[in-house]
Amino acid sequence: MTSDASHMLEAALEQMDGIIAGTKTAADFSDGTCEPGLSPPSTCLNSMPVLHLIEDLRLALEMLALPQEREALLSQVPGPTATYIKEWFEDSLSQVNHHGAASNETYQERLARLEGDKESLILQVSVLTDQVEAQGEKIRDLEVCLEGHQVKLNAAEEMLQQELLSRTSLETQKLDLMTEVSELKLKLVGMEKEQKEQEEKQRKAEELLQELKHLKIKVEELENERNQYEWELKATKAEVAQLQEQVALKDAEIERLHSQLSRSAALHSDHAERDQEIHRLKMGMETLLVANEDKDRRIEELTGLLNKYLRVKEIVMATQGPSERTLSINEDEIEGSFRKWNTTNKSPEEVPKQEISPRCSSPTPGPPPLPQKSLESRAQKKLSCSLEDLRRESGDKCVDGNQLSPVGEPKDSSFLAEQKYPTLPGKLSGATPNGEAAKSPPTASLQPDSSGSSQPKLNRGWSVSAPVLRDTEGGWEDIVSSASSGTESSPQSPVTPDGKRSPKGIKKFWGKIRRTQSGNFNTDAPGMAEFRRGGLRATAGPRLSRTRDTKGQKCDANAPFAQWSTERVCTWMEDFGLGQYVIFARQWVTSGHTLLTATPQDMEKELGIKHPLHRKKLVLAVKAINAKQEETSALLDHIWVTRWLDDIGLPQYKDQFHESRVDGRMLQYLTVNDLLFLKVTSQLHHLSIKCAIHVLHVNKFNPNCLHRRPADESNLSPSEVVQWSNHRVMEWLRSVDLAEYAPNLRGSGVHGGLIILEPRFTGDTLAMLLNIPPQKTLLRRHLTTKFNALIGPEAEQEKRDKMASPAYTPLTTTAKVRPRKLGFSHFGNMRKKKFDESTDYICPMEPGDAVSDSHRVYGVYRGLSPLDNHELDGLDQVGQIS
């Protein structure tokens, strides 16, 4: 609509030119007159299109109903055109209004006015022409833009087609991938099913192993319980034998008292005292009967526990299978022991009915007496208070051979008058407060009879229920060993001629387990080793006598290691920290020469030492004791090493070091493989242990060489700082106003030796370990200044030289030490060289390699340092897989 109006306006303007050209004719035509000689009347008709155009313009404007559209159209009309049309309409209206006045004007005036109008119109036309040209240029520009957009549209359509094609191909690939994913899911389900089956099998295998371990532990516990029950049974037998002897003695005492009463009836008419004495004796007998009943109940309890143990053993035997028959105890032997015990054990009702003459024979022989430890541990627990009363009331009696002699009678009445109860025995001469025996000589002792068993002969100078204390216990235990082996050993147990059981079946999986006979007490047996006096299962509390010296230790104290006896070697291993292998050592080691000639493979096979560091510990100790080398590092045990780990700031490895029994000598010969086996994989921790061992070397393995507490802060030298412990370094951090960061050093392995001896350990490394953010530059600068002042100028210069070297790599907390990867050419050496034969010592310096450079204290440490640069840079490449 707007474009049509513009075209109409342009046409009207073109017509205006013709109007201007024929102004006079038009004026004449408008007046209705045509002069002769002018243009014909047809020229007067040229104004008709203008009228039509104006009429069309009016109709077009009427069609624009909205004012906004009219305003928009008006704004598009050029200003001169609108002004001209306005003036034209005003002139037309003025001509209509002043037609009468205009008619009087002359043609010349009208012509001049029209000329002026023509000029103005020409000017307007030129302006409009310029505007039309400008709009034409804009139209051409728009056409060019349109062509460009058309090209872009075509390109976009082509790209759209390509995108559609690629999308189609992607859809096809997607379908293929979905098909492959489905197949992979099926395979995954199958693999998961197989994995579940494998895990189920592995879980069952682990459960089987756990069950086997539990069964092994259960068998060991049952074995220990059986041994304890055997000890308690023997102790009970000995106590019952003592009680029977006491009953016999009391019966003889009663008969003697009856005879004394019959003889002294004329002298003592006081029946009240006699009745009181008889009542007192009756009470003693009743108390003794109650004690016997208690012992019977105890025997019944032990019998029930033994039966329970036998039932559990049968269950274990059913689980283990018939191959474990050789590990079971002899049930017939136990039952025979019970039958023999029941024959010797009289019921409490039968005891007072026995007729015993005043000169009675010796009591019935009981089981062989127990070792001194057993009597000491049970003397105050098992006997009742009635026995204590009877012990206090028992007099000076003497059993000589098979005859019991009564107490001598008083010779005069004055002695009877002094005694309130003349027929009762006097006080027993006991022990002195310091544990020594009284001066009254004993009149009886334990004497072995011809059958090999010992017949207990009571020493009445001592208490009946108290253990007989002596300086040594060898005689007692020899009697016990000979008696038990001679009277109660069973020939039915399947043993080999050399006294060892042959391992069969699942016994190989459990290890070599040696079980004792039910009635056999062998002090050298592995199961009895824990009952040895002075061992782990010794009597609690202070010892009542001097510990028995092992046979042969007195005579071979200065003997070479190759001539050591089995017992001495086992004692040495137990004191050395390898007591868990003593059981197998008793079976395999015949003398010290066995260990001297043994290889690590023999130790693993015969002694069951699977732990490589345990083998290494034993090999080093055997070499040192055979060569009689005086190494100060050997004085530091594995307990000290755990405390040493606390001092150097590595307490997280205490369990591994303690389990491996790492002592001072092993620190001296510690290798990189050993550290990797101990789960020390951090490069920083390797360097920490290396520097700490080096400090020990320089100080000749002085156990107190590390300083744990602050001393003089004003005068610190590198020789003092190198001996700082981790705790001392933390105290130094607190002294330099870094207390909030000091706890971060726990478990870091930072100590004085690492600070001084490690060239790559700088102030930045310490700041990194303290977790000081890099943004806190002032705090890091303060720490670096204090650190450089602490280590001294020589160490500072060495660290700077190290940092300036082209091969320098900064020390980090994440660097790991990995085992060295061996090529095919190293496989032969790898087969020949085992784990515990490696010589790649982490600190190979010997204590005797010291340099006489004492005027430079720092040089004493740095001059002897084994920490060379190429070793430090390549530490993450060391280690060897065995």
From Swiss-Prot:
GO CC list: presynapse
Function in brief: May regulate the disassembly of focal adhesions. Did not bind receptor-like tyrosine phosphatases type 2A.
One of the record's GO molecular function terms: identical protein binding
UniProt feature, compositional bias: Basic residues: 502-515
Domain (SAM) ranges: 564-628, 636-699, 724-789
Residues in coiled coil: 101-303
Keyword entries, A-Z: Coiled coil, Phosphoprotein, Repeat
Keyword set includes Lipid biosynthesis: no
Superkingdom of source: Eukaryota
Classification via PANTHER family: LAR INTERACTING PROTEIN LIP -RELATED PROTEIN, LIPRIN-BETA-2
Domain notes for this protein: The N-terminal coiled coil regions mediate homodimerization preferentially and heterodimerization type beta/beta. The C-terminal, non-coiled coil regions mediate heterodimerization type beta/alpha.
UniProt note on tissues of expression: Expressed widely. Strong expression in liver, kidney, intestine, heart, lung and testis. Low expression in brain and thymus.
The name this protein goes by in its record: Liprin-beta-2
Compositionally skewed regions (Basic and acidic residues) per UniProt: 388-399
Alphabetical list of InterPro entries matching this protein: Liprin, Liprin-beta_SAM_rpt_1, Liprin-beta_SAM_rpt_2, Liprin-beta_SAM_rpt_3, SAM, SAM/pointed_sf
Lineage: Eukaryota, Metazoa, Chordata, Craniata, Vertebrata
Regions of compositional bias (Polar residues) in chain numbering: 442-457, 481-495
Family of the protein in this entry: Belongs to the liprin family. Liprin-beta subfamily.
Chain positions found as Phosphoserine: 328, 362, 386, 502, 518
Region of interest called Disordered, as start-end residue ranges on this chain: 339-554
